[in-house]
Design a protein with these regions (language model features):
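P-loop NTP-binding core
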Residues: 1-172
Length: 172
């Protein structure tokens, strides 16, 4: 959904919590530069200081490494952080995502997340991805990587129109 405030982060975190509470090894990937899922799952550690050492490495650094020519890239599994909940892990977000997005706009980079999640998926029963409130590089990367998609939206005419536009964009 290309709109904030419809509950994407809350739904993502709550579905992940239910999954983990059922004994399933669960991962949340926070692709939203607002870092709401990260804050839900890591609590005070994540509030107001996304650059804290406890929040590194994060998904912003994962994408930034594709822009670097420094050699071997770290696998996505090295970006996973435990949470205070059993069976629930998170790859935290960072506001840096918004700053580097324009540098990632290329056809081969859009598939990087799908390839990385394919590798890490063997370690998890369920992976939930929280996306930003925009149809951008990160949202498209998540849609390409996902097996299923849940799109929350308000039931007004504007939101329905935005949903139809999103579905058309995904179809392309």
């Amino acid at each position: 959904n290309q709109k904030g405030g419809v509950g994407k982060s809350s739904i993502t975190v709550n579905l992940a919590a239910v999954s983990a509470s059922q004994g399933l090894k669960t991962l949340v990937l926070d692709l939203d530069p607002q870092c709401n899922a990260t804050q839900y799952l890591l609590g005070e550690i994540a509030e107001y200081a996304p650059d804290k050492p406890e929040l590194q490495p994060n998904i912003g650094q994962f994408f930034a490494q594709t822009l670097s020519l420094k050699g071997r890239e770290k696998p996505l599994s090295e970006y996973v952080h435990p949470t205070r909940f059993d069976n629930l892990h998170v790859i935290p977000s960072n506001p840096e995502l918004g700053e580097i997005e324009h540098l990632l706009q290329s056809k081969h980079k859009i598939y990087k997340l799908a390839a990385a999640l394919k590798e890490i998926s063997r370690q998890y029963d369920n992976i939930f991805i929280d996306t930003p409130p925009a149809f951008n590089f990160y949202t498209l990367s998540a849609l390409i990587a996902a097996e299923r998609c849940l799109i929350p939206f308000d039931c007004d005419a504007f939101s329905r129109r935005a949903l139809y536009t999103l579905l058309e964009n995904v179809g392309e």
